[in-house]
């Protein structure tokens, strides 16, 4: 399924109130493709697994005990699916070259087996042999980072059932040893490795779902960690990322709070301490998050994947960065059912950032490719009691005005209003007494 969307606006009828909601990525066009994968995809990774210079997709299929590899055909499509058997309950996957041969290997966290599976890349997109690494109870996340300064990527798992992180150091040939166990807050669901205190060493930050906190563990430079700091955030944090949101050269922290439908932004004071918390509201139940310059202005924007309530489609919320640590232009696009994970990468080599969600509820990946051009934007104005004019700039060749009562992914239909033109604009006149209507241009 492929479709382009322009602005989505919300018409709220309450006395003479009309509210316009900006388009995704300030009007940037996306081509949306749905890719079938294994049952219950809970994570997606991006890497060139077959060495053809194109970024491929890898999903961790929690209910199938498999990974699915979809190779990029170079034109924005994906095929040549391969299925890889891993441990029980793969919940997260990461792609990184662990043995120094220049090829991205795959590592997944198996939450029912309390293990990591390591699959080495043979150079043409095939993988083997598998290695199994024991970690803590119920690992739900894995990240690769050089934590001891030897130039080799180590592995860190977030063990939700044990409230710990497991650190496995890389011996340089693809093997791992010297496991360390680090205690964090209750129910860690994600971990990020980032230098938050400016000493050149990768620190660890976990998002602790049951504790409603982040734990910051500073790196001593030899692979050990100390000075635990606890940061209060919203209810049920499921994801955490590190990026410089205000342009001061320091890595700030952002977490997605599933229980409060919010993101928390914590600014870095330069010594690894955090303050000036800002709360950003997103649409229902944020489950994952990435940072990426989605609109090409050189500033890192925030994108959350929102689980939503079944049977409503999941959504992505995009919040654009104003460059001083603030975020605006909150905008929404529909994806598949129950998006668990999110990735951002330039999949078609056009210089713009594309988005990929792993949708647990319908066994798919949703791929949103930026087309590189702006779409016509809708605007709304009151013209009388319970009457509105919805308009857009011409030309808008090939676009159809659609409406929906609830922003679901399945109930959009042709609006059916008479379109009239006035010089450089086209539009429709709407009379309605319902509380909310949503409109979009679709192609």
What is each model feature region?
Residues 63-65, 112-114, 161-163, 210-212, ...:
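Short glycine/acidic-enriched loop and turn motifs that connect beta-strands
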Residues 53-55, 79, 102-104, 151-153, ...:
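Glycine-aliphatic tripeptides that mark coil-to-beta-strand junctions in extracellular
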């Amino acid at each position: 399924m492929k479709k382009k969307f322009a602005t989505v606006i919300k018409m709220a009828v309450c006395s003479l109130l009309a509210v316009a909601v900006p388009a995704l990525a300030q009007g940037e066009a996306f081509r949306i493709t749905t890719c079938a994968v294994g049952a219950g995809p809970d994570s997606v990774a991006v890497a060139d697994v077959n060495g053809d210079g194109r970024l491929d997709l890898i999903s961790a299929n929690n209910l199938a005990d498999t990974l699915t590899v979809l190779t990029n055909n170079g034109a924005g499509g994906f095929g040549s699916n391969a299925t890889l058997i891993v441990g029980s309950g793969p919940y997260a996957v990461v792609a990184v070259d662990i043995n120094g041969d220049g090829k991205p290997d795959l590592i997944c966290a198996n939450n029912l087996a309390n293990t990591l599976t390591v699959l080495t890349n043979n150079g043409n997109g095939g993988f083997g042999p598998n290695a199994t690494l024991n970690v803590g109870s119920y690992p739900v996340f894995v990240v690769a980072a050089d934590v001891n300064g030897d130039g080799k990527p180590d592995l860190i798992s977030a063990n939700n059932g044990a409230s710990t992180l497991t650190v496995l150091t890389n011996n340089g040939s693809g093997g791992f040893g010297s496991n360390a166990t680090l205690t964090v807050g209750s129910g860690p669901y994600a971990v990020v490795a980032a230098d938050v205190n400016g000493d050149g060493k990768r620190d660890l930050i976990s998002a602790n779902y049951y504790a409603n906190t982040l734990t910051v563990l500073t790196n001593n430079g030899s692979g050990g960690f100390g000075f635990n700091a606890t940061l209060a955030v919203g209810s049920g944090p499921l994801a955490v990322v590190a990026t410089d949101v205000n342009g001061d050269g320091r890595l700030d922290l952002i977490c997605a709070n599933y229980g409060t439908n919010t993101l928390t932004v914590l600014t870095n004071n330069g010594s690894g301490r955090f303050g000036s918390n800002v709360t950003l509201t997103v649409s229902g139940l944020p489950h994952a998050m990435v940072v990426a310059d989605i609109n090409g202005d050189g500033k890192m924007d925030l994108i959350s994947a929102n689980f939503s309530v079944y049977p409503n489609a999941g959504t992505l919320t995009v919040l654009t960065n104003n460059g001083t640590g603030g975020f605006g232009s909150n905008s929404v696009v529909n994806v598949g059912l129950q998006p668990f994970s999110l990735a951002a990468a330039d999949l078609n080599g056009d210089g713009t950032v594309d988005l990929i969600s792993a949708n647990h509820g319908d066994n798919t990946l949703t791929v949103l490719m930026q087309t590189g051009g702006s779409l016509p934007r809708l605007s709304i104005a009151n013209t009388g009691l319970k009457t509105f004019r919805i308009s857009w700039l011409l030309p808008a060749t090939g676009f159809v005005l659609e409406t929906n009562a609830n922003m679901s992914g399945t109930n959009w239909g042709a609006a059916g209003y008479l379109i009239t033109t006035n010089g450089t604009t086209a539009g429709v006149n709407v009379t309605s007494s319902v509380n909310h209507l949503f409109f979009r241009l679709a192609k």
